[in-house]
Swiss-Prot record:
Name of the protein: Alpha-tubulin N-acetyltransferase
Organism: Trichoplax adhaerens
Function (record text): Specifically acetylates 'Lys-40' in alpha-tubulin on the lumenal side of microtubules. Promotes microtubule destabilization and accelerates microtubule dynamics; this activity may be independent of acetylation activity. Acetylates alpha-tubulin with a slow enzymatic rate, due to a catalytic site that is not optimized for acetyl transfer. Enters the microtubule through each end and diffuses quickly throughout the lumen of microtubules.
EC number: 2.3.1.108
Gene Ontology cellular component annotations, sorted alphabetically: microtubule
GO molecular function: tubulin N-acetyltransferase activity
Taxonomy, superkingdom: Eukaryota
Reactions the enzyme catalyzes: L-lysyl-[alpha-tubulin] + acetyl-CoA = N(6)-acetyl-L-lysyl-[alpha-tubulin] + CoA + H(+)
The keyword Transferase is annotated on this UniProt entry: yes
InterPro entries: Atat, GNAT_ATAT
């Protein structure tokens, strides 16, 4: 998605993590500059959130209405969620464009296993995952998803997915071998059998809670995209 301003000023990294401070700029700025960049960031988040909502067919949205959008800057600002935003810089006359978003956060859930037993848990949940239609089937979704996994220090099978689309479930099966075979959860989250193994280990005291890690993606060199931060080095020429 393209914007009429330089997105790299508001999104300093190839994949930028945004929390409730709405302040990923990582440098000293005067008040006026910070407000301008933050306002541009709000525009990015809200427009990508609206695009995601439309793609998920939640409801029809207009440019004046954010009702139904899972991801908005206002909602992010009053939560403990994290939003990962993937960009591409050397397009749109150098202004760049936003490729996709991925929002995660912990939620207290009651989930049912194969036996019908109910468990209370606090898993990391995928709350919104959207890659712009023009950038799908290019590896961008997996790039964004894997970066989140590493940053949050989480295993895919331990995630809870909020109302995943058929396309998202196919993505999880293709790349991680995960199948939606458990009974349908009343809360519309999809979970996997390995999550119950984790719950049992935690109850028995046999596992330590993982903490998110701090990742800093490199700045891609001119004309090429660097994907060095996933223990891989891939150079993609324009």
């Amino acid at each position: 998605m393209e914007f009429d301003f330089d997105i790299s000023q508001s999104l300093p990294d190839f994949i930028t993590k945004v929390d409730n401070t709405l302040n990923p700029f990582n440098r000293q700025l005067d008040v006026t500059s910070r407000k301008r960049l933050q306002q541009n960031l709000i525009v990015i988040i809200d427009r990508m959130g609206m695009a995601s909502a439309k793609a998920r067919l939640l409801r029809r949205l207009t440019a004046q209405s954010l009702k139904g959008a899972i991801t908005t800057a206002a909602k992010l600002g009053i939560s403990d969620h994290r939003l990962y935003i993937l960009k591409e810089t050397e397009v749109n006359r150098g202004l760049g464009k936003v490729v996709g978003i991925l929002k995660v956060g912990k939620k207290k859930l009651f989930v049912v296993d194969y036996t019908g037993a109910q468990h209370e848990c606090l898993p990391l949940c995928v709350l919104d995952f959207y890659v712009h239609e023009s950038q799908q089937r290019t590896g961008n979704g997996k790039l964004l998803f894997e970066y989140m996994l590493k940053a949050e220090n989480v295993t895919p099978s331990h995630l809870a997915i909020d109302r995943p689309s058929f396309k998202f479930l196919s993505f999880l099966q293709k790349h991680y071998g995960l199948r939606d075979t458990l009974p349908k959860q009343v809360n519309n989250f999809v979970v996997f059998e390995d999550l119950f193994n984790l719950i049992r280990k935690k109850k028995s005291g046999g596992i330590t809670q993982h903490q998110p890690t701090s990742l800093k993606p490199p700045i891609p060199p001119t004309g090429r995209r660097c994907m060095h931060f996933l223990n891989l080095t891939i150079w993609q020429t324009r």
